[in-house]
């Protein structure tokens, strides 16, 4: 039986944790804007992070990259969770951060008494964005495994991640939330869940969102109670908060993943970019050329619509 646990995150426990930085030789980030023609060419911006050595091996057909989808909080940009994306990338994931709202969407409002306090339309729109972005990323990164996703999100993004998991449980590998407040956890034990909770009096989860200790035990859910504020859980947060979350997340991935991929040392990766073994250079160059063509056509379409 998978065991759940409620943890009080201690800074002293993770003081020696590795720092996950986007060293230019180890992890790279790239931002792209896709336009959804079925929704009036709605722009859907994504930023993906990937380990360079694993990307090259995947492009050469040597492996498939697991995929993590990161969802931002309300009013926060999709690029403000690189501290999380880098942990996934260091573990060999293709980490895709998606911008789920645009200025023309208007502000998100709270409607007490309605399901998810009236935010269901935002969740549904986000799911459409995620599905669309995945289809576009398949063209750019076909060497990733999009059949089983790790859904990640902070605050409203955590609710989006949990709602997606409720709607598409067969497509989920893991769920990681940071202080989601509205959508109750999935408790049927079909996939692993890790949730970081803030110690913030201004951000309290709705009743029934976070399971009690017995339910966590039965469902294999890990709840990490921290002393951090709600808004500490993003790139602008204090280093001790981000470092602690990174360390616990990395441990969760190490325990949850069946692969032998270990995090790269992003401060000394230049000499060990590739693992031993031949790489078909022609195949790799064809992949690179095709990706460049796709990006150029996407940028040309974006310039025509602006």
Name each model feature, range by range.
Residues 33-144:
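Serine-hydrolase catalytic machinery in alpha/beta-hydrolase-like enzymes
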Residues 4, 12-57, 263:
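An N-terminal hydrophobic leader/cap segment in hydrolases
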Residues 185-190, 213-217:
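Short, conserved loop/helix-junction motifs that constitute active-site signature segments
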Residues 64-67, 91-94, 146-148, 170-174, ...:
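Loop/turn elements at helix/coil->beta-strand transitions in domains of secreted/extracellular proteins
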Residues 202-209:
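Conserved alpha/beta-hydrolase "acid-adjacent" motif
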Residues 219-298:
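C-terminal catalytic histidine-bearing segment of alpha/beta-hydrolase fold enzymes
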């Amino acid at each position: 039986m998978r065991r759940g646990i409620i943890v009080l995150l201690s800074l002293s426990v993770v003081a020696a944790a590795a720092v996950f930085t986007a060293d230019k030789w180890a992890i790279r980030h790239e931002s792209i804007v896709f336009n959804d023609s079925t929704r009036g060419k709605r722009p859907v911006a994504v930023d993906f992070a990937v380990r360079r050595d694993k990307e090259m091996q995947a492009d050469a057909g040597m492996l498939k990259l697991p995929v993590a989808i990161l969802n931002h909080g309300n009013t926060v940009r999709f690029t403000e969770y690189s501290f999380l994306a880098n942990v996934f990338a260091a573990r060999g994931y293709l980490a895709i951060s998606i911008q789920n709202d645009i200025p023309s969407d208007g502000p998100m409002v709270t409607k007490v008494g309605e399901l998810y306090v009236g935010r269901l339309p935002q969740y549904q729109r986000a799911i459409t964005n995620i599905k669309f972005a995945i289809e576009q990323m398949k063209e750019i990164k076909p060497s990733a495994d999009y059949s089983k996703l790790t859904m990640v999100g902070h605050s409203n993004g955590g609710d989006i991640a949990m709602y997606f998991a409720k709607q598409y449980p067969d497509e989920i590998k893991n769920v990681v939330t940071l202080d989601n407040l509205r959508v109750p956890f999935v408790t049927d034990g079909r996939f692993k869940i890790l949730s970081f909770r803030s110690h913030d009096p201004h951000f309290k989860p709705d009743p029934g969102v976070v399971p009690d200790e017995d339910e966590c035990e039965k469902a294999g859910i890990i709840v990490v109670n921290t002393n951090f504020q709600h808004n500490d859980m993003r790139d602008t947060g204090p280093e001790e908060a981000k470092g602690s979350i990174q360390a616990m997340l990395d441990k969760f991935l190490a325990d949850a993943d069946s692969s032998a991929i270990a995090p790269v040392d992003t401060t000394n990766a230049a000499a060990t970019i590739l693992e031993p073994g031949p790489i078909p250079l022609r195949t790799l160059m064809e992949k690179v050329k095709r990706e460049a063509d796709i990006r150029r056509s996407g940028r040309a379409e974006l310039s025509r619509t602006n």
